[in-house]
Amino acid sequence: MVHNKNNTILKMIKGEETSHTPVWFMRQAGRSQPEYRKLKEKYSLFDITHQPELCAYVTHLPVDNYHTDAAILYKDIMTPLKPIGVDVEIKSGIGPVIHNPIKTIQDVEKLSQIDPERDVPYVLDTIKLLTEEKLNVPLIGFTGAPFTLASYMIEGGPSKNYNFTKAMMYRDEATWFALMNHLVDVSVKYVTAQVEAGAELIQIFDSWVGALNVEDYRRYIKPHMIRLISEVKEKHDVPVILFGVGASHLINEWNDLPIDVLGLDWRTSINQAQQLGVTKTLQGNLDPSILLAPWNVIEERLKPILDQGMENGKHIFNLGHGVFPEVQPETLRKVSEFVHTYTQR
């Protein structure tokens, strides 16, 4: 076990005094790291995630290289879907492709339930390896939100308009709600197993939920999100972060959920979120594209985010989306260092 652990992010969420604003980056594990790219010449994403030693190495890299205040487990939101009967393939340049999309309630009924110890032991073994031996910062486990997972399962892959997904919601509520309930059950078991293995925070990625309006979110999504988070928290008092893209119109709905941290994309400032009545710890939210700019521009954009975060009092610095592969590792290191220095108290 690691002594003198850096628990800054957990202290921030609890409202305790911290020495600086904690920082981590979505997609910090992999992508822009040369060590990771070298591994990808030999191994696929699923190859790496199925080998705990390799997966732990990739997960740990950004903590060593960028001095982040948290690690996030290297895996894909599709990980729990394969074991329940979803024929998913990760295609380069496309993303997840589902070869047996959900169309009817019979398709939902064919899905099995997940047994994490049996179906994803490599995920749990990676977490145990990290938390028992090496990691000196909290580990973030994660899952895709039911809507985002369902959208892939129904559309058959990434989508711009989510027409098939919305059509199912509007035309066939029985199938939609059956799928939502099944995915909540899967997610609760999957997340709970991660926490029991040693994850100290959970992030729920609802990447595509911004495609819905408020009325549809309330009717078709919100009750299932409440059940997912509540059932996890009934088992373990673990902080939960929720993040989505292009979903500022849903901020008040998210603030109602039993989450601890609300992740902002780059379109909504911390001050705007406060003005909308958000009471949660806020996470974010530098536009990841800014990391491709010269350092003076990056620093200029960092300061107002950090100033607003310090004024708010409960802020975790992150990007407003994931790290782009083109971002230089040195840039991420400098951002992390700047956040720590600028917010030092």
From Swiss-Prot:
Catalytic activity entry: uroporphyrinogen III + 4 H(+) = coproporphyrinogen III + 4 CO2
Binding site for substrate: 27-31, 46, 76, 152, 207, 321
Record site feature (Transition state stabilizer), residues: 76
InterPro entries to which the protein is assigned, alphabetical: UROD/MetE-like_sf, Uroporphyrinogen_deCO2ase_HemE, Uroporphyrinogen_deCOase
A Pfam family annotated for this UniProt entry: URO-D
Example GO BP: heme biosynthetic process
GO MF term list: uroporphyrinogen decarboxylase activity
CDD domains reported in the protein's UniProt record: URO-D
Source organism superkingdom: Bacteria
Keywords, ordered alphabetically: Cytoplasm, Decarboxylase, Lyase, Porphyrin biosynthesis
HAMAP family in UniProt: URO_D
Family statement: Belongs to the uroporphyrinogen decarboxylase family.
Function of the protein: Catalyzes the decarboxylation of four acetate groups of uroporphyrinogen-III to yield coproporphyrinogen-III.
NCBIfam families named among the record's database cross-references: hemE
Protein name: Uroporphyrinogen decarboxylase
Organism field: Staphylococcus aureus (strain NCTC 8325 / PS 47)
The encoding gene: hemE
